[in-house]
Amino acid sequence: MVEGHTDDVPYKTGAVIKDNWDLSVMRATSIVRLITAHKGINPQNITAAGRSQYEPLLPNTNADNRSRNRRTEVIITPDLASIERMLQDISID
């Protein structure tokens, strides 16, 4: 999963981006497009999500913190069925 994040400053409404929700989704989808186009990742195996301003790393109390909150995160989730099979194989040995 790729998550896009923003700070809490309202986005100035534009023709394409309406608010921080749109901006966070666009951040995530731009990374997803790069990964699927250039790294051979199957688009069925990746998700883009926008978190807007609602999961800040730091309080949005100054410019430096707001800058750190404007980010994109790549979250790698394991295939749980594969892990379960590996654990079963270990317990059998």
What is each model feature region?
Residues 5-93:
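Periplasmic OmpA-like peptidoglycan-binding domain that tethers envelope proteins to the cell wall
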